[in-house]
Amino acid sequence: VLAINLDGVFNCTKVFIDQMLKQSFGRVVNITSVIGQIGNFGQANYAASKAGVAAFTKSLAKELAGKGVTVNCVAPGFTETDMVTSIPEKVRQKLLDQIPMRRFGKAEEVARACVYLCAKDGDYITGAELSINGGLFM
């Protein structure tokens, strides 16, 4: 988990950064998780890896801010995916009871946040960790 989530983000970023710096423009959007923000029983490795991605994002944002490259991350909460739908109904209901909006997120909502950060509207946003979790973590 640590190698995929941390090394994967680092190695993918390395591939694109030089070109972004050459053109003095670029957008990096990493995916973290609400679990990286709040932790979760039995998921110490996953939580640590996602928190590491957030810290990497903020550090890289500081390094590249004056060079035309923004670096942000999106931290989805529980989202309607195969992983969440496979959770037993009783546990899913307990999760929903903790989410003020009383529903799971949709993949499209996460995607729209990524598009926003990459669009002109996101020009002045860097080093941000955008939480998309229905109010689960504020």
Indicate residue ranges for each PLM-predicted region.
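C-terminal substrate-recognition "lid" of short-chain dehydrogenase/reductases
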Residues: 25, 103-132, 137
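Residue(s) in the substrate-gating loop at a strand-loop-helix junction
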Residues: 33
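Active-site loop immediately N-terminal to the catalytic Tyr-X3-Lys motif
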Residues: 38-44, 66-67, 102, 120
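Active-site helix of classical SDR
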Residues: 13, 49, 57
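Alpha-helical segment proximal to the catalytic Tyr-Lys
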Residues: 18, 62-66, 123
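Active-site loop-to-helix junction immediately N-terminal to the catalytic Tyr of the SDR YXXXK motif
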Residues: 39-47, 59, 87
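Short, flexible catalytic-loop segment of classical short-chain dehydrogenase/reductase
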Residues: 37, 75-86
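Catalytic Tyr-X3-Lys loop
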Residues: 1-10, 25, 29, 46, ...
